UniProtKB/Swiss-Prot annotation:
This protein's pathway: tRNA modification; tRNA-queuosine biosynthesis
Pfam families (UniProt xref): TGT
Gene symbol of the encoding locus: tgt
GO molecular function ontology, one term from the record: tRNA-guanosine(34) queuine transglycosylase activity
Name of the protein this chain belongs to: Queuine tRNA-ribosyltransferase
Enzyme class: transferase
Cellular component terms per the entry's GO annotation: cytosol
Cofactor note: Binds 1 zinc ion per subunit.
Source organism per UniProt: Prochlorococcus marinus (strain MIT 9301)
Catalytic residues of the enzyme: D92, D265
Subunit field text: Homodimer. Within each dimer, one monomer is responsible for RNA recognition and catalysis, while the other monomer binds to the replacement base PreQ1.
Xref: HAMAP family: Q_tRNA_Tgt
């Protein structure tokens, strides 16, 4: 039911194209995955999302458990029917949100107790419960519960959290019993190569349908992000889809693809869109600026998204300056289409044996010149 098929390899780097087969369709990789935290990509309908070429989206277990609750989603027929999305869905376990958003009361090997950020009530999440929630949600891919410490934590604290992540992974595997849902483990270890290698090898030993690398782009220096991207893949299985969590810039995506990563997600396209900022090549255009008031060109004349085909920068500037919701939605839609188009072009370049020339991260000028 779940299969990852590698369809081509770059002769000079670790980049590859592939097809990840799921019960709700296939995902052509490399691929960017829009974030729909609460079973919605903010301001964008499922029909619009399909028009961008999106093939898989991410929703969040932590947030959906708190509101509206997994039992309601299950009663609706599962998350696909609940949000009217016919393609694959991956649910993040919520580990990052628990440790970054909630006021923690207690962390133990059994799980985490915290205050609900919505109403202050006490909530307890264990690895077993997190898996059961995701089984009720009915996503195609469930993520193991992990402990993601702050990037400022010292090596001893990160090692302690890593042992907890590994213990929880074992419990997640033992609890997960849904044949039509894949379980991915998550590699942690912070900026420490020894811990990253240890975690990659341990997580890989479970032979799960896919594997993710977490604890990246959580406030650390860019050099540390690149170090993890360059180092960890050599310890991951080749025949599994590799998911790099929380990455959405062109440079980091191209670097990650060069090192053999396949799937990416990031909130930036919609977060920036809601503030009036649009992606253009490897730049960001703040459409709130006065210089766009009389600019009747689209955000990107080479982009085929609904926004660029139908609306000018001047109109979007007008919407943003007047706090019109439509403007935020249209820019977010373009930003998602931009990243989908970028990963699609990377796939074409890999198949045509020109990835190194066109998209390798050290060739930043080729990205800036918009070869895709």
């Amino acid at each position: 039911m779940f299969e990852f098929e590698i369809t081509s390899d770059c002769i000079n780097t670790g980049a590859r194209t592939g097809i990840f087969h799921t019960p709700n369709g296939k995902v052509n990789t490399p691929k960017f995955m829009p974030v729909g935290t609460l079973a919605t990509v903010k301001g964008i309908s499922s029909k619009q999302l399909i028009s961008t070429g999106s093939e898989m989206i991410l929703s969040n277990t932590f947030h959906l458990h708190l509101q509206p609750g997994e039992k309601l989603v299950k009663a609706s027929g599962g998350i696909h029917k609940f949000m009217n999305w016919p393609k694959p869905i991956l649910t993040d376990s919520g580990g990052y949100q628990v440790f970054s958003l909630a006021k923690l009361n207690n962390i133990s090997d059994e799980g985490v107790e915290f205050k609900n950020p919505r109403d202050g009530s006490h909530v307890f999440l264990s690895p077993e419960k997190v898996i059961k929630i995701q089984m009720d949600l009915g996503s195609d891919v469930a993520m193991a519960f992990d402990h993601c410490p702050p990037h400022t934590a010292n090596e001893n604290d990160i090692e302690d959290s890593l042992e907890r992540t590994h213990s929880w992974l074992q419990k997640c595997v033992e609890t997960h019993q849904k044949s039509n849902q894949a379980l991915f483990g998550i590699v942690q270890g912070g900026k420490y190569p020894r811990l990253r290698e240890y975690s990659a090898k341990y997580t890989s030993s479970f032979d799960l349908p896919g594997i993710a690398v977490g604890g990246v782009s959580v406030g650390e220096a860019v050099e540390e992000i690149h170090s993890v991207i360059n180092y960890v893949p050599k310890f991951l299985p080749i025949n599994k889809p590799r998911y790099l969590m929380g990455i959405g810039s062109l440079k980091e995506i191209s670097l990650a693809v060069a090192n053999g990563f396949d799937i990416f997600d990031c909130v930036l396209p919609t977060r920036l869109g809601r503030h009036g900022t649009a992606f253009f090549n490897d730049e960001r255009l703040n459409l709130r600026n006065a210089r766009f008031k009389n600019d009747f060109s689209p955000i990107d004349k080479t982009c085929k998204c609904e926004t660029c085909k139908s609306y000018s920068r001047a109109y979007l500037h007008h919407l943003i300056r007047n706090d019109e919701i439509l403007g935020l939605s249209l820019i977010s839609l373009h930003n998602i289409a931009h990243l989908i188009r970028f990963t699609n072009a990377i796939s074409t370049a890999i198949r045509d044996n020109c990835f190194t020339n066109d998209f390798a991260p050290w060739k930043t000028s080729s990205i800036a010149h918009h070869t895709w």
